[in-house]
Amino acid sequence: MKMHQLRYIVEIVNQNLNVTEAANALYTSQPGISKQVRLLEDELGLEIFERHGKHIKSITPAGKKIISIARELLVKAQGIRAVADEYTRPNHGVLRIATTNTQARYMLPSVIERFSKKYPDVSLHIHQGSPTQIHDALMSGEVDLAITTEAPYLFDDLVQIPCYWWNRAVIVSPEHPLAKVKELTIEELGKYPLVTYTFGFTGVSDLDYAFNSAGILPNIVFTATDADVIKTYVRLGLGVGIMASMAHTALDTDLVLIDASHLFRPSMTNIAFKHSTFLRNYMYDFMEYFSPHLTRSVVEKAERLRDNNSVKKLFEGIELETK
């Protein structure tokens, strides 16, 4: 059993069982991957994948367990390299972060500017996506840290550290009837077609809770993962926008921002990472730059805790900022 064989079977799963795409991602050949997977299966005496002809159709029950362990082994191997780099090249490396468009566009620029000045030899890679995509990128080892804003239940098996609260706001054109409303109500908002985040109405979200509590079925006409796209379609008159208030800037003079903090419960932005992740010194610094209360000592305490309920208790005495 060799590490590259484990890397191959994990990447096949990452690429939705497409061996050709796995080969492309790993810069190797499809026949080479297929041969190594077969050699691994022969060594183990079982099949990891179910096949139909030459094509992989699914993962066997044993294969699912093997791939889960393989992922952890690859993370640990990556951790060994990180430990070595920490001692031999402490200010060199890579930091890979998965987050939403809103965080990448409106919250991270100042953090990255400060970070890059201190660590010019650390390459930063930002992966943008939905909560599910962010979770999958973290679990597959594509990224080191995840900055999450929705669906915290997806990250229950990971270290999840609270950063700050954020509120939603409503945006409309100056000519829209809601632009003249003194205090917006959920009933009034429910009368109009809505444009909001793609995952804003999946699962038990704060938006779900607000509308369900009022007995209102919202008319969602368009969804997007990008706040800038939401603003574009509001400008086109498609509907009333609901987005993070931080996404409204001084450049959006043609849009009226209406406070909705009294309509929807605030949401939490968290930083998440795997329990098995070896955090480099520059990763601790990044977290503190992003959220000043996340000093190294605080993060290390959170790392030692084995469940997120304990992590929440750790932060009970800390008043988190609201954005």
UniProtKB/Swiss-Prot annotation:
Any Gene Ontology biological process: regulation of DNA-templated transcription
SUPFAM superfamilies assigned: Periplasmic binding protein-like II (SSF53850), Winged helix' DNA-binding domain (SSF46785)
Listed PROSITE patterns: HTH_LYSR (PS50931)
Subcellular location: Cytoplasm
DNA bind region: 19-38
HTH lysR-type domain boundaries: 1-60
InterPro entries: CysB_PBP2, LysR_subst-bd, Tscrpt_reg_HTH_LysR, WH-like_DNA-bd_sf, WH_DNA-bd_sf
Keywords per UniProt: Activator, Amino-acid biosynthesis, Cysteine biosynthesis, Cytoplasm, DNA-binding, Transcription, Transcription regulation
Assigned GO CC terms: cytoplasm
One example GO MF annotation: DNA-binding transcription factor activity
Keyword Protein biosynthesis: no
Any Pfam family: LysR_substrate
Subunit structure: Homotetramer.
Similarity field: Belongs to the LysR transcriptional regulatory family.
Function: This protein is a positive regulator of gene expression for the cysteine regulon. The inducer for CysB is N-acetylserine.
PANTHER family the UniProt entry points to: HTH-TYPE TRANSCRIPTIONAL REGULATOR (PTHR30126), HTH-TYPE TRANSCRIPTIONAL REGULATOR CYSB-RELATED (PTHR30126:SF6)
Protein name: HTH-type transcriptional regulator CysB
Record organism: Haemophilus influenzae (strain ATCC 51907 / DSM 11121 / KW20 / Rd)
